[in-house]
Structures are given as structure tokens and as C-alpha cells.
Amino acid sequence: MNETTNEQEVLLLRRKLDLLLRTGKLLMESAADTNRIERNMKRVAAYLGIPEEKLHIDIRWTMLMVNVSDEKHSFSKFQKCEKHGINMEAISKISKLSWRAIEQDYSLDKYEEELEKIARQERNYTPYVVAICTGFACGGFCKLFGVTGLLF
């Protein structure tokens, strides 16, 4: 019976780490900054009951890595991030979801369902809008530092 309990605990921890990584992946692929990703992932880990002192998060452009370790065990999971784009609405919704999950004590199924709703939503910005706005941002940056219209 003890072995079965141990296996169930490991499966539950793996599921929690998977949810944590999917949260981070959505943030990364929506162009959230590293501090926001880490802050939100730590908040979600707190909701999931993973102690911060046992949690290790490493954020790279194409990979998220999470490790939970104590004196006896160490569990690591990795998540590849491939579809980078801009989606400020997803970033905002994930942050609000993490707070709601804590305040309303969501079940893992409820959290996963809400996370999937956010993941399925279409992005607000088409590539053309992003390209045009990037051009305006670059132009504004040039104007800020005194570049004249002739040089621009």
C-alpha cells in the first residue's frame, strides 16, 4: 500500500509540474518578460502546494525547466517553447487566473480547464499589425534621440 501511495504522489506531482510548465509556456509564447513569467509560475506553484524553497525554475527563450527537490527526491520537467508572439490579453488572463485559483481554491481540473480556454483563444494582433506598430515604435525611438526626418 505504501508503494501505491508513493506512486500516486509522484503522479500528482508530475501533473502539477505539467500545469506549472504549461502556464509558463503560455506566458513565454505570449511575450511576457522573464520576471513576470517567474513571478506567475511561483504564484501558481504556491497554489499547487509546491514550496518555493524546493522549487527551481530556469527560463530560456526556447525552454522552460522546473525542478522540485528535497533531501531524498528530485523531479525535473522541461517544456519547449516554439510559437513566440505577442498576446497581452493572455498574459493578463493568466495572471488573473493564478490569483483566482488561490482565492477560490480551484481544483486541478478547474485550473487546467481555465488554462486551456486561454490557450485556445486567438491572438489579438495579426502579423501586419505587429509589423506596423514595430515600425512606429522604432520611429518613435529615433525621434526620442534626435534623429531628423531626413535621416529617418
Task: Write out the residue ranges for each language-model feature.
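Hydrophobic, membrane-facing alpha-helical anchors
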Residues: 101-115, 130-139
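Core alpha-helical transmembrane segments of integral membrane proteins
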Residues: 123-152
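Soluble N-terminal domains of membrane-associated systems
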Residues: 1-106
